[in-house]
C-alpha cells in the first residue's frame, strides 16, 4: 500500500478532458451519461483519465487531425499515444454512462437517441476495448444517477461517490 503524499494536487477534469501523469495528482470528475476511462500501470505507477461525452465524432464535424477526448475513438488514441510497454499491462476501469432522465422525463422525450446516450457511450467504449483486446479490471456503469470519481495517480486507487437514494 502506498501512502498518500504530503501534498496532493487536485485536478478537475472537465467533460471532454484528458489527463495523463503520475505522482501526487488526484484527478476528479463528475459523470452523468458521460463515461470516464481510466488507465493505470501498477508497476510504473502512472496513468490517466478521459471524460468521454459521445461515442463517436459526428460526420458533420470535420477532424482537423487533432484528437479530442470528447469522443471515445479519440480518447483511446490519446491513451495509446501515452502508453509505455504492453497495453495489456494496464488496468482499465470504466465509470458512468447513467441514464439521467426520470421516468416522467423519459416519457416526454421523443428523441430516444438523446435518452440512450449513456448506454451508447458504454457500448462504444467496450467495443474499442474488445477491438484492442483489452480487459476491464473494474467498472461501475449505467444506473440512473451521477457519480463523482476520484483517481489517485500515486497508487491507482479510484473512489466513486454516488448520491444516497431514499
Curated annotation (Swiss-Prot):
Enzyme Commission number(s) of this protein: 3.5.1.44
Pfam families: CheD
Disulfide bonds: none
Molecular functions (GO terms): protein-glutamine glutaminase activity
Superkingdom, natural source: Bacteria
A single GO BP: chemotaxis
Annotated transmembrane regions: none
Extent of the signal sequence: none
Coiled coil: none
Catalytic reactions on record: L-glutaminyl-[protein] + H2O = L-glutamyl-[protein] + NH4(+)
UniProt keyword list: Chemotaxis, Hydrolase
Role this protein plays: Probably deamidates glutamine residues to glutamate on methyl-accepting chemotaxis receptors (MCPs), playing an important role in chemotaxis.
Family statement drawn from the similarity comment of this UniProt entry: Belongs to the CheD family.
The protein's name in its UniProt record: Probable chemoreceptor glutamine deamidase CheD 1
Gene from which this protein is expressed: cheD1
